[in-house]
A protein has these predicted regions:
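Juxtamembrane "helix-exit" motif on the non-cytosolic side of transmembrane helices
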Residues: 22-25, 49-58, 116-124, 182-189
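Membrane-interface interhelical loops and short amphipathic "cap" helices
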Residues: 52-65, 126-134
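C-terminal transmembrane-bundle signature of multipass membrane proteins
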Residues: 76, 151-212
C-alpha cells in the first residue's frame, strides 16, 4: 500500500514540475528554477522508495537511498530562498533589498554545509521495511534535523509576511502542515506522511506564483 502511495506522490510531483515549467515563461524568476530543482529531488526520493522492494536489499539500493539523503541535504534549505524570492516577487519591499537576499543565500549555504558535514558525511544506513516498502534509513538518528526545522520555521515566518501582503495564506499554511506532518515519527507511519506534506508546501509555492 505504501509503495503505491509513494508512486502516486512521484506522479504528483511530476505534475507539479510540469506546472512549474508552464509558469516559468510568465515568471522567469529564480524561485521557479529552484522549485524545479527541489521537485526533481522529491521525484527521485519517492520513486526510489516505491521501487525499493522490486530492486531488493543490497548495495545498489543502499547507494540509491544514500543519494536520497544527499538530495535532502542539498535541496531542503533551498526552500528558504524560494520563499524569499516569492516574497520579493509578490512585492514585499523588505525582501527586495539585496542585502536581505544575500543574507538569505548565506544562511541557506550555511544550512546545506551543516547538513552535509554533520549528517551526510557521517551517514550510516540500515535497511527497513514499512507497509510493503523497502528502503534504507539512518542507523543512528539521535539528533533532530535542525537544518530542516529551521528552514521550515523561517519559511512559515515569510509565509505570514506574504499573507499580509497578498491576503493569501497558502505558504504559511503549507509550511505549518509540513512542520507538524514531518514531526510525526517515521517509526509510526514510515515516510508516507512526511512525503505527503512536502507536496502541500510545494503546491502552496506554485499557487502563489500562479496567483501573481
Amino acid at each position: 500500500m505504501a509503495a503505491i502511495l509513494h508512486l502516486i506522490y512521484t506522479l504528483t510531483h511530476l505534475g507539479l514540475m510540469f506546472w512549474g515549467l508552464h509558469l516559468f515563461p510568465q515568471s522567469s524568476n529564480i524561485a521557479t528554477i529552484l522549485l524545479l530543482v527541489v521537485l526533481t529531488g522529491l521525484i527521485y526520493d519517492n520513486l526510489i522508495i516505491s521501487l525499493g522492494s522490486l530492486i531488493g536489499e543490497g548495495e545498489v539500493l543502499e547507494f540509491l537511498n544514500k543519494l536520497r539523503f544527499l538530495f535532502h541535504a542539498l535541496f531542503t534549505p533551498l526552500l528558504l530562498v524560494i520563499a524569499v524570492e516569492l516574497a520579493n516577487y509578490a512585492g514585499v519591499e523588505w525582501f527586495a533589498n539585496p542585502i536581505v537576499r544575500l543574507i538569505t543565500w548565506l544562511i541557506t549555504i550555511g544550512l546545506i554545509e551543516f547538513e552535509f558535514r554533520k549528517k551526510y558525511l557521517k551517514l550510516k544506513l540500515e535497511s527497513t521495511t514499512f507497509a510493503g516498502t523497502l528502503r534504507y534509513r539512518e542507523a543512528e538518528s539521535n539528533s533532530l534535523p535542525m537544518a530542516a526545522i529551521l528552514t521550515i520555521v523561517l519559511v512559515a515566518v515569510i509565509g505570514i509576511i506574504i499573507w499580509q501582503t497578498l491576503q493569501c495564506p497558502w505558504v504559511f499554511v503549507g509550511a505549518l502542515i509540513m512542520f507538524f506532518g514531518s514531526a510525526v515519527p517515521t517509526r509510526l507511519v514510515g515516510p508516507v506522511l512526511g512525503s505527503g506534506v512536502e507536496i502541500v508546501l510545494l503546491l502552496s509555492f506554485l499557487a502563489i506564483e500562479y496567483q501573481m
